[in-house]
From Swiss-Prot:
Organism field: Buchnera aphidicola subsp. Acyrthosiphon pisum (strain APS) (Acyrthosiphon pisum symbiotic bacterium)
Highest taxon listed in the record's lineage: Bacteria
Identification of the protein by name: Carbamoyl phosphate synthase large chain
Cofactor(s) in the UniProt record: Mg(2+); Mn(2+)
Keyword Metal-binding set for record: yes
Length: 1079
């Protein structure tokens, strides 16, 4: 049947900011949905608060709202745009929950808006644990022994039936948020209390323990005629007890018998029918007891998910695109398979002749003190996917793609002391993020398959594969470099061994192994992802490398080829913003007649969609992989400046190997990143930097710190995302840094910088073509200097900087751009103190602020920049004038502290945010209020405020207290702050710090007495107190600020209604055009 004609316009809900459990896979699905429905002629209205997404580009929808995803905002959009239908299945749990709230409040019925993609009843049956269990019983499918609880008393009644250990999962949350495994009454009560707080429906599902069971997932698509297909089966290498998002997964499933697979397949289809998923994609999860084969249904998601993105990239079947078209009435047999063209339709189940492995990426090092053990609550921040002909090839490629410094199954045991076997056993039994390497060590040091299975419950089939890799490593070591004859070398490559890994094992360097391989004429071939195991020819060039005879790459003879290197797996400091730039690069190149070739290994991203570039190589971003692609494609140029540090760190090696890098040269990049070279540049230009020094020892640090003066910023050289950076206020803090943060026998130079307290930090994005510099935007940070730029909110245009200071910033940006010979994008960070401008750092590459600035000013900076890199000047493109919008845009960071209990949540120089939101308003305060709502800031507009600030902030707090009083807040203050307030005639209630006696701050927080907390600190004891306060504020959902500037911005925002004014990005950008036309 053809598409629905009674629908003319569709409102799509996005997923909002990137958070743990809900990442950029929903930008991928949302972008696919927008494109699919727009090409069918529907008017598309989009709501998403995340500016770093491709789906919020103005050309993706007819009306794009970069506003908070909140039911009242959605109602205003419905009133204004009058959509016929709402599609909530592309925006993760955020969109589903919003749709349920709209239905509950009667808004959809009131305005006659129908939900497509999934009915409200289907969402409820899938998400509500009791309804889901009832549905499974009707199908004679088992679920885990469980019970529902809505309070602690009910929870303990369920526990009597379920017993220990048990798994606790809050309803309507994502990524296992708020859940956990309880082994005793104390843990049980703690997890239940937290789960009840986080569940929107105040509901818990308490399950019997399935720890050690095998876990599987089925990606299912169904149409309105009840045609059902299994797109992909996925097997978790890690057993139940570890969240599937934190587990290594393999597709297709490797250890199911055909009978088990068919039972699971049929059950999946029956579940979709019973739940009522009439059209679209769903994910169904199963567990199998390896001892007796008992199968139970864990859960199902009636929407596209993280696994849907993985399955789409693993098979080439675009689940989100197909689901969007099914939602408007098409059937599977009416839709063509984009990969095979007219050869097959979407009703053909994909068949694959390769193995896909996904490995999650963790950032525990960013959260000292957090529990790094893997449980039912998701903790990973990204993932990598690799494709190979065998599991061994696939997993070794995935390990390399992770970018954690591993070339393969590197040993984690540095010396065989008396404890090494105990450590291996502990790491196998109580899984952390590095368990896969400890499995390698277990076999390396003599443990058997059964030993490892008993400790991990990982299926022996996988363990046999890993053990064989370790045995091969021993053989490589034994034979040495001279043993690398053609047949053995070729055999190793087919097993997934990289040049780098072989080099380590033979005690050679990578270039020596590469030269030998070239001499032996050993090169990979490229196979195509075709959905049909090579049964039909493909119309798309979506490829992976392997080691066989026939190559299917078939590169064109086009001499206008450009390779774009992506950013690999998401991590804190390098996320979706860089993928946004890579996608824009591909789009601009294709628009200008270039052949765009993408190289990346992240399955969540838009850049790895097969139709974004002309050719896609799904490969790790390593020297070996990129050189082989360059060899076969022979590009005119390679772009390394858009994928963050991942491709940049290979720049010098590329240059040595003759790779044609376009844009800013590697030498210029090194000048900016090398401390000594950059200092010379700054001095030559007669610009200013904060006082600084480089030291190796603590004694040296004491001496230099005395010269610079406390407080100082301390960090190792060459760090990413502020890694291991700290602000030190006194000699004791310096000693503590050397003892606790640095490894023993540290040989890395330590950088000391003057910390400019009370300085305002400024970010500038600009483009230089060698003749002209285009200022993209001057962003003023809301938190003062010392908070990592990625964690600070910022405003464009600047909201307090004078025009004189801004003009001087512009002058300095231009001088630096020309001196560094920048060709393309650059980002400069400044600190302003007492009207003096200090340069913090310069990055001659794309920065994480590029998407935000592009949305704020209405110019696609990444596209303009890539054209500059390809030889088109700014003048030729018509972009030479800085745009200062006649409205304000605020970018606010979203932090994951609620996922990491016990971590110090005070903001500092080490970046820890996972995502961002954008607020747009007629003035700064309105824009900031919207960004707060978009970031789910729980800010009440009345009640009692706690003020506890350091001595240096006491003068500034007076004005803040006056403003809070005017708003009707009552004030509590700690001793020193209370005295300062009293001197200025402001009354407050005195409250004790924890070490000062009871009742103290913690007691009052537990009693729900506070609506808002302002807490700044400096000294060692103050930091300890502050950590306790902020952690408690998080626990009890009280908004807090740890900088006075942040507090002033919050108070300004309290005067605004973030829901009052909404406008489309298209109209906002039109205002800019009209504004500059009138000028």
């Amino acid at each position: 049947m053809p598409k629905s004609t009674d629908i003319k316009s569709i409102l799509i809900l996005g997923a909002g900011p990137i958070v743990i459990g809900q990442a950029c896979e929903f930008d991928y699905s949302g972008t696919q949905a927008c494109k699919a429905l727009k090409e069918e002629g529907y008017r598309i209205i989009l709501l998403n608060s995340n500016p770093a997404t491709i789906m919020t580009d103005p050309d993706m929808a007819d009306a794009t709202y970069v506003e908070p995803i909140h039911w009242e905002i959605v109602e205003k959009i419905i009133q204004k745009e009058k959509p016929d239908a709402l599609l909530p299945t592309m925006g993760g749990q955020t969109a589903l929950n919003c749709a349920l709230e709209l239905d509950h409040k009667g808004i959809l019925k009131k305005y006659g808006v129908q939900i497509i993609g999934a009915t409200v009843d289907a969402i409820k049956k899938a998400e509500n644990r009791k309804l889901f269990e009832h549905s499974m019983k009707k199908l004679n499918l088992e679920t885990a022994k469980c019970g529902i609880a809505h309070n602690i008393q009910e929870a303990f009644l369920v526990l009597n039936n379920v017993g220990f250990p048990c798994i606790i999962r809050p309803s309507f949350t994502m990524g296992g948020h708020g859940g956990g495994i309880a082994y005793n009454h104390e843990e049980f009560e703690k997890i239940c209390e937290r789960g009840l707080e986080l569940s929107p429906s105040t509901e818990l599902l308490i399950d019997e323990s399935l720890i050690g069971w095998k876990e599987y997932e089925m990606e299912v698509v169904r149409d309105k005629n009840d045609n059902c297909i299994i797109v992909c089966s996925i097997e978790n290498l890690d057993p139940m007890g570890i969240h599937t998002g934190d587990s290594i997964t393999v597709a297709p499933a490797q250890t199911l018998t055909d009978k088990e697979y068919q039972v699971m397949r049929n059950a999946s289809m029956s579940i979709l029918r019973e739940i009522g998923v009439e059209t679209g994609g769903s994910n169904v999860q199963f567990a199998i007891n390896p001892k007796n084969g008992r199968m139970i249904v864990i859960e199902m998601n009636p929407r596209v998910s993280r696994s849907s993105a993985l399955a789409s990239k693993a098979t080439g079947f675009p689940i989100a695109k197909i689901a969007a078209k099914l939602a408007i009435g098409y059937t599977l047999d009416e839709l063509a398979n984009d990969i095979t063209g007219t050869n097959t339709t979407a009703s053909f189940e994909p068949s694959i002749d390769y193995i896909v492995t996904k490995i999650p990426r963790f950032n525990f090092e960013k959260f000292p003190g957090c529990d790094d053990r893997l449980t039912t609550q998701m903790k990973s921040v990204g993932e990598v996917m690799a494709i190979g002909r065998t599991f061994q090839e696939s997993i070794q490629k995935a390990i390399r793609g992770l970018e954690v410094g591993a070339s393969g199954f590197d040993s984690k045991i540095s010396s065989r002391d008396s404890e090494y076997l105990i450590k291996i056993r502990r790491e196998l039994k109580d899984a952390g993020s590095e368990r896969i390497w400890y499995i390698g060590d277990a076999f390396r040091y003599g443990m058997s398959i059964n030993d490892v299975f008993d400790l991990t419950s990982i299926d022996p089939w996988f363990l046999v594969q890993i053990k064989e890799i370790i045995l091969l490593e021993k053989k490589i070591i034994k034979n040495g470099f001279i043993g690398l004859k053609y047949d053995f070398f070729y055999f190793l490559k087919r097993k997934g061994f990289s040049d780098q890994r072989i080099a380590i094992l033979t005690n050679k360097n990578e270039s020596e192994i590469r030269q030998l391989r070239y001499k032996l004429n050993l090169h990979p071939v490229y196979k195509r992802i075709d959905t049909c195991s090579a049964e039909f020819s493909t119309e798309t060039a979506y490829m992976y490398s392997t080691w066989e005879d026939e190559c299917e790459s078939h590169p064109s003879k086009n001499n206008k080829k450009i390779i774009i290197l992506g950013g690999g797996p998401n991590r804190i400091g390098q996320g979706i913003e860089f993928d946004y730039c890579c996608v824009h690069a591909a789009q601009a190149l294709r628009e200008d007649g270039f052949e765009a070739i993408m190289v990346n290994c992240n399955p969540e991203t838009v850049s790895t969609d097969y139709d974004i570039s002309d050719r896609l190589y799904f490969e790790p971003i390593t020297l070996e992989n990129v050189l082989e692609i360059v060899r076969i494609e022979k590009p005119k140029g390679v772009i390394i400046q858009y994928g963050g540090q991942t491709p940049l760190k290979l720049a010098h090696e590329f240059e040595k190997e003759g790779v044609p890098i376009i844009g800013t040269s590697p030498d210029s990049i090194d000048t900016a990143e090398n401390r000594y070279r950059f200092q010379k540049t700054v001095n030559k230009l007669r610009l200013q930097q904060p006082l600084n020094a480089t030291v190796l020892t603590l004694d040296e640090a004491y001496k230099k710190a005395d010269i610079i003066g406390y407080p100082i910023m301390v960090r190792p050289s060459y760090v990413l995302g502020g890694r291991a950076m700290e602000i030190v206020y006194e000699p004791y803090g310096l000693e503590n840094y050397f003892k606790t943060t640095l490894k023993k026998n540290n040989t890395t130079p330590i950088l000391l910088d003057q910390y400019l307290d009370y300085a305002t930090e400024v970010d500038v994005d600009a483009i230089c073509d060698g003749e002209t510099v285009l200022i993209g935007g001057i962003m003023e940070h809301i938190e003062q200097a010392g908070v990592h730029s990625g964690d600070s909110a910022c405003s464009l245009p600047a909201y307090t900087l004078t025009s004189k200071v801004q003009n001087e910033i512009r002058r300095q940006v231009k001088k630096l751009a020309f001196e560094l010979s920048v060709k393309g994008l650059m980002n400069i960070q400044f600190a302003i103190k007492n009207n003096k401008i200090y340069i913090i750092e310069v990055n001659p590459r794309a920065a994480r602020t590029v998407p935000f600035v592009s949305k704020a000013i209405g110019l696609a900076l990444a596209k303009i920049s890539v054209r500059v890199m390809c030889g088109k000047t700014l003048l030729e493109q018509g972009f030479i004038k800085e745009i200062i919008p006649p409205y304000f845009s605020v970018k606010e960071a979203v932090l994951p502290f609620d996922k990491f209990q016990g971590v110090d949540p005070i903001l500092g120089p080490e970046m820890r945010s996972t995502g961002e939101v954008m607020g747009i308003g007629k003035n700064f305060s309105e824009a900031f209020s919207k960004s707060m709502l978009g970031a789910h800031t729980n800010m009440k507009k009345s009640g009692r405020v706690l003020l506890s600030v350091r001595n240096n902030d006491k003068n500034n707090i007076i004005n803040l207290a006056v403003k809070l009083k005017k708003l009707g807040f009552k004030i509590d203050a700690t001793k020193g702050t209370s005295v300062a307030l009293k001197k200025s005639g402001i009354s407050s209630r005195l409250v004790n710090k924890v070490h000062e006696g009871r009742p103290h701050i913690q007691d009052r927080l537990k009693n729900g007495e506070y609506s808002y907390i302002v807490n700044t600190t400096s000294c060692y004891q103050g930091i300890k107190d502050s950590k306790l306060i902020c952690r408690s504020a998080l626990q009890y959902k009280v908004h807090y600020d740890t900088t006075v500037n942040g507090a002033f911005a919050t108070v300004m925002a309290l005067n605004e209604n973030p829901i009052k004014n909404i406008e489309t990005l298209q109209k906002i950008h039109k205002k800019i055009q009209l504004f500059y036309t009138k000028k």
